């Protein structure tokens, strides 16, 4: 039989599908710059639990925000991973709305690649970046990250990015979704 997870997606079709799913609760900002592998930034803002992504899980309460970046890289090396992790982190930090009432901000680079080097995968899974503001009175920032390797269908994440990884798996690979190509 054919490997079901095998290349059913190009990076472009995978990203298009993710953007379609994210657009229900994120504001999507397509990237302007063609030289840059970031294809879109998806912004999520929430005040005291107005958005519930699934009826079962209310993920965040109070003032929370997430900046999720979809990054299209054919072959992810450790060097590329570190370069774009740092770029996204710096870009995201500039966007945070920090102050009283702010609870948490997530900066979430999601790497969409055909293939990925093991050292890049390891670095991504170990990545931990967080910061608290004003001794946590003004909340905190956590760096979540996930990776989809389309040639194998493997999805990895750092500890903070697990819910992102679950969402990616559901959107890209759950059998229910196969019908609506």
Label each PLM-derived region with a short phrase.
Residues 99-125, 149:
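Nucleic-acid nuclease catalytic cores
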Residues 5-73:
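N-terminal, charge-rich interaction modules
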